[in-house]
Amino acid sequence: MGLPWYRVHTVVLNDPGRLIAVHLMHTALVAGWAGSMALYELAIFDPSDAVLNPMWRQGMFVLPFMARLGVTQSWGGWSITGETAVDPGYWSFEGVAIAHIVLSGLLFLAAVWHWVYWDLELFTDPRTGEPALDLPKMFGIHLFLSGLLCFGFGAFHLSGLWGPGMWVSDPYGLTGHVQPVAPAWGPEGFNPFNPGGIVAHHIAAGVVGIVAGLFHLTVRPPERLYKALRMGNIETVLSSSLAAVFFAAFVVAGTMWYGNAATPVELFGPTRYQWDQGYFRQEIARRVDTAVASGASLEEAWSSIPEKLAFYDYVGNSPAKGGLFRTGQMNKGDGIAQGWLGHAVFKDKNGDVLDVRRLPNFFENFPIVLTDSKGAVRADIPFRRAEAKFSFEETGITASFYGGSLNGQTITDPAQVKKYARKAQLGEAFEFDTETLNSDGVFRTSPRGWFTFGHASFALLFFFGHIWHGSRTLFRDVFAGIEADLGEQIEFGAFQKLGDPTTRKTAA
């Protein structure tokens, strides 16, 4: 059959056995990719520094998804939370990866079997002897099973009743760990940052799915609805499946880009809005103010700030930095973080404290501008030296460090002060190793950015697929040129007036 490449799926029309075979093969490919990708990531992952070199800085994609479901330890004796000499048993990163590869092999064999033995009696309508599928019944079966899975995931895995729970953390991504989570049934369950809502909604959605599945298994659709929605056509199944998938893809693109309950900061990196809104900066300032109010010096207050929290307050960790087509992990851009230099406080020769205006997300270059408490510009490093109105040399800018490796030091050399002002524009100042990975200094996005872009793109593609196949199945008669109310084949010359049966010609 001379089919063009874009029509090859026609071969599984009216062939339920091979329709199952291609779905089994697709699932085999997905499971095989997941397992293989996990082993590849484990081969290149460096677990030595969970604070400054976490998995999201190293470009890990499948490991964070395993970790958020409770798999955090390796047969290599390490854990992503920093512990060593751990014994995870079977459910380690490697164990889960191997399980996926074994599953992929079994699914491959099942696909081959169903491709060879396609003509099963199971798929034959006993009344007609033709291959047929009871699609409404299959819809009920799938709905029931997916509801059961959804309910079980929430009621057992996430709740800890029979499973590890899920990854939870504080609002600033410092204390992340896996623990059982109780469902939140009240209004607090609708807080998008509350993990208890995830558990409750899986249980509730699972119950709805189970009930709806049983309903569709026991109640047949009305004939008018069956015909109106083309429930007997396999392309209707394709269209509605595409709708479900594109809707889910849009939802997860949104939760990945905006939220961090299901996509924790420790595993996927910060969101861009946390940089835009100075989220971590405000928390650091609050902690410092609280410590100073309790009698601590500035050096002591800043030294108490966790390095992990300071590292989040750095623009290079924002997923909005770095273009979509810059390949590679974040560490290939600015380098591997080595340590926090400390918080730089800039002052002019009059002793006024100045603030470095921070780099906005969507700028690659930005002039260094230092403003006073009223927002007036007091010093700058413009793009062109000839345009400098408030040079560091003239205004006598100094940089004093609190916390970090430079704690207590004051820098007065203008060249060095400019260096640290450039770092301060990017958030908290860190030292980076750019040699190990030959980092090029151009920011990369995090797996949070890749996931969002990929799912938003495919959601749009699948949306058009839904419209296309939905139109084909609803208006199949129109596209085929056969109208529903056409009673007989019209032949030119059959009527004196074309199409008017009252003027039918009679044989002479």
Curated annotation (Swiss-Prot):
Q: Which UniProt keywords apply?
A: Chlorophyll, Chromophore, Membrane, Photosynthesis, Photosystem II, Thylakoid, Transmembrane, Transmembrane helix
Coiled coil (UniProt feature): none
Pfam families linked to this entry: PSII
User: Any idea where this protein resides?
Assistant: Cellular thylakoid membrane
Q: Which GO terms describe its molecular function?
A: chlorophyll binding; electron transporter, transferring electrons within the cyclic electron transport pathway of photosynthesis activity
Q: Which SUPFAM superfamilies match?
A: Photosystem II antenna protein-like
Q: Superkingdom of the source?
A: Bacteria
Q: Which GO terms describe its cellular component?
A: photosystem II; plasma membrane-derived thylakoid membrane
Note accompanying the cofactor annotation: Binds multiple chlorophylls. PSII binds additional chlorophylls, carotenoids and specific lipids.
Instruction: Please give the biological process terms from Gene Ontology that the record holds.
Output: photosynthetic electron transport in photosystem II
Family according to the record: Belongs to the PsbB/PsbC family. PsbB subfamily.
What is the role of this chain? Answer: One of the components of the core complex of photosystem II (PSII). It binds chlorophyll and helps catalyze the primary light-induced photochemical processes of PSII. PSII is a light-driven water:plastoquinone oxidoreductase, using light energy to abstract electrons from H(2)O, generating O(2) and a proton gradient subsequently used for ATP formation.
Subunit info? PSII is composed of 1 copy each of membrane proteins PsbA, PsbB, PsbC, PsbD, PsbE, PsbF, PsbH, PsbI, PsbJ, PsbK, PsbL, PsbM, PsbT, PsbX, PsbY, PsbZ, Psb30/Ycf12, peripheral proteins PsbO, CyanoQ (PsbQ), PsbU, PsbV and a large number of cofactors. It forms dimeric complexes.
What's the protein here called? Photosystem II CP47 reaction center protein
